[in-house]
Amino acid sequence: MDRDLEQALDRTENITEIAQQRRPRRRYSPRAGKTLQEKLYDIYVEECGKEPEDPQELRSNVNLLEKLVRRESLPCLLVNLYPGNQGYSVMLQREDGSFAETIRLPYEERALLDYLDAEELPPALGDVLDKASVNIFHSGCVIVEVRDYRQSSNMQPPGYQSRHILLRPTMQTLAPEVKTMTRDGEKWSQEDKFPLESQLILATAEPLCLDPSVAVACTANRLLYNKQKMNTDPMEQCLQRYSWPSVKPQQEQSDCPPPPELRVSTSGQKEERKVGQPCELNITKAGSCVDTWKGRPCDLAVPSEVDVEKLAKGYQSVTAADPQLPVWPAQEVEDPFRHAWEAGCQAWDTKPNIMQSFNDPLLCGKIRPRKKARQKSQKSPWQPFPDDHSACLRPGSETDAGRAVSQAQESVQSKVKGPGKMSHSSSGPASVSQLSSWKTPEQPDPVWVQSSVSGKGEKHPPPRTQLPSSSGKISSGNSFPPQQAGSPLKRPFPAAAPAVAAAAPAPAPAPAAAPALAAAAVAAAAGGAAPSHSQKPSVPLIKASRRRPAAGRPTRFVKIAPAIQVRTGSTGLKATNVEGPVRGAQVLGCSFKPVQAPGSGAPAPAGISGSGLQSSGGPLPDARPGAVQASSPAPLQFFLNTPEGLRPLTLQVPQGWAVLTGPQQQSHQLVSLQQLQQPTAAHPPQPGPQGSTLGLSTQGQAFPAQQLLNVNLTGAGSGLQPQPQAAVLSLLGSAQVPQQGVQLPFVLGQQPQPLLLLQPQPQPQQIQLQTQPLRVLQQPVFLATGAVQIVQPHPGVQAGSQLVGQRKGGKPTPPAP
């Protein structure tokens, strides 16, 4: 296809060259008259046979229409193009040869001009041409003479440039011609009009070439291109820039006066006049300067030395003593360490302004209280005094900023009110060196207690401890080492040794050790008194260490591992090792005062083990009577006696029971443990988390003024060695709390859960609790390995399995049947 097209284009060029070189042949028409096309062809043949008169005139066969009009004086339509905004007009020729103006249009109306460029007869002029007195149609075509006055408007008289255009009819003009011809009195049917229209089309159409060749179409396109090469879109855009529709808006804008705000001021006009004046500068040569005043030549010599100090003017540099110093914006560093504890305290926001003096590297910081909690106070920028040079400060470096932040923290820590620091002390036969039996390759780091700061920091709600359920895993905090869960002990209850040393495993104790625990609890309740501030308390103070609080986690979890084992008969304070998670847990490290349990011949060491203990600063939650579902545990709150006052301790327990005695029942019945595991061969320690899960569900009873809660934690699992874990706490409170029981499930590894049930005689009654100091007592603990079945004792059980005590001391009394 492309090859055929290329051949057709080559043939077109050859035909054009041959037609221009050879002489055309003359044609003879059989008709008497000749058409307009035939007349033009005859002139073309005639011009091609002539020799050029002027050597520069290479072609004479052009402008055939002008030659035809001059030769035959044919009537034509006249179009005048006037200069400027006068527009253009259309004029018809009269019979006497004069022209009458018919239509005058502005240049903005380009419809008629577009038809002239396309060499087509405009349909709008059909009626005007039909009414003309002179017939200007020639074989259905109209000859238009265009007179352009725009190029020679300055001449007198104004001249013009003339050219002729042949307008050919179109289908839009032939249809009105058919109607015009059939207007006479005769009636023309539609069948008669069709032959008339066909004859008009054939008469006005140009000759057709029916040669089936692509070269014919290519030749026609090339001829049309040569005729319309100046009518392309880019050329029209360039010509329209200088046409009147485009120039007119520019002239109108230049003729209009500028707005008042854009007028040049008078001073500016004077400057323009000065600039416009010519300035004559006569630069003479050096040495030819003449002093016009004295009339003698002036020799200008360059001085060898110039006293600069006399001629120059110096400016003093800005120093630190200059009072006019720039005001530096105060740079604020927000202290991320915020302290808050109890409800009702005012929140403070520490924002030290880090500024450094010019004279010395002293730093100053500011601590401003906030107006509202959890909102930053707006501070006015620091302004130096003009007369006070010591107040001239500048922004410090990052090192100074860090130093200022540390100073601000120290100032806050020194001014806040919190518990004092007190280290754990130990006396008696117990020694801290005995912790070696509990050491593991990966010991958890001891966690210091973060003390509450009254009046500083953010306000947090009282945290509550949720102990994990019996799933064998601890939800938060570091798990105890495997060797703690199954530490090899020589025997569970040493009789005379001050501490338990690492040795081979021993058989489990007998069930008769349970009464020792009950009796020891009664004796501790009767004989133990609240410690005073002047004496060394049985509960040591918390060692406070301020740490950065965790964002968004007000609840902190703690684990307390038993560190040493002591005999019942020993005296003095005992130390405990406190272990907990990394994130600022609050741990209660207590030393216990041993009490000899009546009725038991063997002492029992004790320790504290918990996986979810936490001190809380909130009030005791109110509880309403009624059954509560086991899935929604209720909190159990204790109070710890410290030099600063009572500290709340909240225990959140999942599911279970622990029955506390009513107000009139003074004794607890401790269920004896049955089906104890027999001593087995020593096995290597099995890994497993060590801890306890406390649970509480309330059902309409209130705690008495003072009760004893004996917690006996037993481990389960084959091959696991017994460990002493017990805590005897004195329940204190100041609100009515329903009481039903506390279940203490304990899990070691993935073995079944042994449960210990403390059940009193059911005497429900509600009384008001009175706030009293907390006593933490160490009692003999019975530990057994293996599955434990919980059985409610019969009233006829031996008296050694019953726990009897009084709230305010006294001798133990047997429980009611």
From Swiss-Prot:
GO terms for molecular function: transcription coregulator activity. GO terms for cellular component: extracellular space; SAGA complex. Pfam families: Spt20_SEP. Residues 469-479, 494-505, 513-531, 598-618 have a biased composition (Low complexity). It comes from the Eukaryota. Residues 1-28, 249-275, 369-553, 598-630, 675-697 are annotated as: Disordered. Belongs to the SPT20 family. This is Transcription factor SPT20 homolog-like 2.
